[in-house]
Each structure stands twice: as structure tokens, then as C-alpha cells.
């Protein structure tokens, strides 16, 4: 939604002078709440116009949540296959086997116990390497080893069907809607308040406001929605127990996660066991907070440059293009930089030993990943992660702003 790693943009207000001098775009003009469009001709409203009508042009909290929810749904449904591919690559690197149950790797699979969700995997009848085990045509073990992004796509489609690429979409939607619905509106609120404080107390620190506000809002959203994210990762990483049998959904997956640590017989132990639903939250925050910081610090300069090139001719389409492009580039850079933390988060979420899972820290997990796979292990799944994060940030940011604008125009009329 998820990795979605999320960002938000703003309508840009440009101040023009009576002369024909170039347009100057100030950093203070990049505001979600302050930036409203001139309804006539879809032009960009000047700063004085915004200051004059700020109270009546403010977007309400409900409208912001609705806009964010729409952006989250579009992003989650469109980009879920890349999230599945990334999770499969990272899970395999962590030691999870995707081999056929009848293959010679059954000993390693037994480690996960009889309740492990494995599909009755079969290659296509046209596979020249398939052998026969009884009446079942199966491939050798390496047919079920993922070798790269494209290889994961082809093998999932061939062995499990095209629909498996949208495995966990319901959990992704259940996660993305509240996640983005909390993140973007609260980002608006935090930033507006911090901007007021910085202008009064420390004007030189105003440039840090978007980074701080984004980190606070992201931390809040991640903490509230984390159990759903844990269920989504489990659903994407594991395969079904039997072919043709519907796999467990979000609720059953969450129950399964909790059941792994439900061995307590007193209140203190019961409260301790609830920590299992937030397993890996530290790694999630360690990934998402830097992601937000990198994304915002990259997005704003790119957006400013693109809108500066457009100058006075910037309209709705131009703002949408600049917003999406800036979000795409910033999201891609942030996703690549934080990939090791995403690998650590995935490894902690799919850990099957409850005791070990609760004791693992992000630092220990990163050291373990480095020991097992070196630099390649730390950046496992970076391709699909970047391919997902770039469009995801661009879609969420641009869609959020466009829907807010449409809702504002409808309310004004």
C-alpha cells in the first residue's frame, strides 16, 4: 500500500509582479491547506488571493480523508503485484522455501510445521523439465526458486495463476485506506501548526517543517495500522496449503499470528503476547520515518523546479504533471535508500519462531541479513520495491490533490 512508503503534495501558489519578470516560487507557497486554485480558467491563485480568502477556502478534514482514501485505493489495487513480487524475493532470501512438497527440499519445509501454507505447485504441462511423481507432473526444485523480478512474475502466473499477483489486495486496501487516511490529513494538521510555531519562534528552521510533520504523521499511521500490515505481508509471502482451497483472509491471518504466541495463563503474559501483533513495528518505523524524510526533502526541490519551468502558464494539467513527476522521482529515491530496512521488516514479520521474533531487533536483523547475503541481501527486492514506490507516491500525491480540488470546487459552487 504498502511497502507503501507514502507522500503528499500541494497546489502551488505563485506570486507574480506587474512587470514581465520571471515567476518566483517561494518555499512558503508549497502548502496543502493554503494552496487553492483560481476557479476561473484553472489558473494559479496568487499569494495575496490565498491570504485574503484563506478561512473560506480551507479544505475540511472529512474532504481530506476522502481524498486520501481514494488515492490509497487506486494505488493499492494498481501496484499490488509488485508488492507481492518484492515480498516473495525477500522471504526467499530469509530462508522460506517455495519448492514443491514432493521435492527434495521437504526437509527444510518441515521446519515450518504442518500448518505452513504451501500450494500444490505444478508447472505448466508444456514445461520440458517436468518429471512425474505418481500421477502428478511436477518440476525439479529449481523451477520453484525465484531468480529475479521477472522470474517471480512468470512463475507465480504459471504455477499459481494470474490472480495470485493480487494476493493480499484486500489486506492492502484495509491497510492503505486508514494508513493514508490518517497520514495525509494529520500531515496537514501537523505542518500547519509547526509552520506557525517556526515562524514565531525559529524562522530559520521553517524548511524542516515538512520533514518533521511527515515523520510524526507517518509514525502515528504506522502504529495504528501495523497489525493489518503484518497480516498482508504474511498473506503475500505464504502459499496455500492445498490447491483449490481458499486461503485465509485478513482476520484469520491475524488470528493465526496471535495464536502462535497465545500460550499465556495469566494477565501479564497475555498482555505480553499482544506484542506479537506489532512484531517488526520497530523495523517498520525505522524504514518509514527515513523514507518520509528523504521523500519530502527530494520532492519539494523537484516540484519547485518543474513548476518554475512552467511559469505563468501552469494550469491544472501542469500542476498534476509536476506533482506526479516529483512524487515518482522522490518515491523511487527514498525506496532505494531504505530498502535494507524493508528487508529487515519483512524478515521479522515472516519469522515463525514466536520467541525469536519478539527478541529480534532491527539492528540484529540487519546484521543477520548482511551475514547471510552481504550487500545483495540488504538490497534484495529493490527492483520491484522501487518500481512500486515511485508510481505509488506519484499516484497518491497527485490524486489526493486533484480530488481535494474537485471537492473544493463542488463545495464552492
UniProtKB/Swiss-Prot annotation:
> Which species is the source of this protein?
Arabidopsis thaliana
Q: Per UniProt, what is one GO molecular function of this protein? A: metallochaperone activity
A Gene Ontology biological process term: stress response to metal ion
Tissue expression per record: Ubiquitous.
Record's bilayer topology term? Multi-pass membrane protein
Database matches in InterPro entries: Mitochondrial_sb/sol_carrier, Mt_carrier_dom_sf, Mtm1-like
State the family named in the UniProt similarity comment for this chain.
Answer: Belongs to the mitochondrial carrier (TC 2.A.29) family.
Q: Which GO terms describe its cellular component?
A: membrane; mitochondrial inner membrane; mitochondrion
Q: What is this protein called?
A: Mitochondrial carrier protein MTM1
Any Pfam family from its record, for instance, is: Mito_carr
Expression is induced as follows: By paraquat (methyl viologen).
Amino acid at each position: 500500500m504498502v511497502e507503501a512508503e507514502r507522500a503528499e503534495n500541494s497546489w502551488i501558489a505563485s506570486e507574480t509582479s506587474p512587470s514581465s519578470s520571471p515567476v518566483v516560487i517561494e518555499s512558503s507557497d508549497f502548502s496543502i491547506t493554503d494552496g487553492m486554485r483560481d476557479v476561473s480558467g484553472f489558473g494559479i491563485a496568487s499569494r495575496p488571493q490565498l491570504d485574503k480568502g484563506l478561512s473560506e477556502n480551507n479544505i475540511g478534514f472529512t474532504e481530506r480523508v476522502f481524498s486520501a482514501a481514494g488515492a490509497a485505493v487506486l494505488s493499492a489495487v494498481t501496484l499490488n503485484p509488485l508488492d507481492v513480487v518484492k515480498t516473495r524475493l525477500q522471504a526467499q532470501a530469509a530462508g522460506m522455501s517455495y519448492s514443491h512438497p514432493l521435492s527434495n527440499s521437504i526437509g527444510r519445509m518441515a521446519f515450518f510445521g504442518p500448518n505452513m501454507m504451501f500450494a500444490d505447485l505444478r508447472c505448466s504441462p508444456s514445461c520440458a523439465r517436468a518429471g512425474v511423481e505418481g500421477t502428478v507432473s511436477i518440476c525439479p526444485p529449481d523451477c520453484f526458486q525465484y531468480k529475479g523480478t521477472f522470474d517471480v512474475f512468470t512463475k507465480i502466473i504459471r504455477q499459481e495463476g494470474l490472480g495470485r499477483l493480487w494476493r493480499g489486495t484486500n489486506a492492502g486496501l484495509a491497510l492503505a485506506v486508514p494508513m493514508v487516511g490518517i497520514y495525509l490529513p494529520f500531515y496537514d494538521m501537523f505542518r500547519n501548526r509547526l509552520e506557525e510555531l517556526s515562524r514565531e519562534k525559529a524562522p530559520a528552521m521553517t524548511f524542516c517543517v515538512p520533514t518533521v510533520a511527515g515523520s510524526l504523521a507517518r509514525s502515528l499511521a504506522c502504529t495504528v495500522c501495523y497489525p493489518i500490515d503484518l497480516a498482508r505481508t504474511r498473506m503475500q509471502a505464504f502459499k496455500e496449503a492445498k490447491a483449490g482451497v481458499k486461503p485465509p483472509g485478513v482476520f484469520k491471518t491475524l488470528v493465526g499470528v496471535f495464536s502462535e504466541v497465545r500460550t499465556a495463563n495469566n494477565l501479564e503474559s497475555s498482555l505480553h503476547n499482544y506484542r506479537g501483533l506489532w512484531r517488526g513495528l520497530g523495523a517498520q518505523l525505522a524504514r518509514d520515518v527515513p523514507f518520509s524524510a528523504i521523500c519530502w526533502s527530494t520532492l519539494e526541490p523537484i516540484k519547485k523546479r518543474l513548476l518554475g519551468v512552467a511559469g505563468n502558464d501552469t494550469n491544472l494539467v501542469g500542476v498534476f504533471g509536476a506533482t506526479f513527476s516529483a512524487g515518482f522521482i522522490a518515491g523511487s529515491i527514498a525506496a532505494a535508500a531504505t530498502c535494507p530496512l524493508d528487508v529487515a521488516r519483512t524478515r521479522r514479520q515472516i519469522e515463525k519462531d514466536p520467541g525469536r521474533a519478539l527478541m529480534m531487533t532491527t539492528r540484529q536483523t540487519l546484521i543477520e541479513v548482511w551475514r547471510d547475503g552481504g550487500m545483495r541481501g540488504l538490497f534484495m527486492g529493490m527492483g520491484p520495491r522501487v518500481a512500486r514506490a515511485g508510481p505509488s507516491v506519484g499516484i497518491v500525491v497527485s490524486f489526493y490533490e486533484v480530488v481535494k480540488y474537485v471537492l473544493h470546487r463542488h463545495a464552492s459552487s
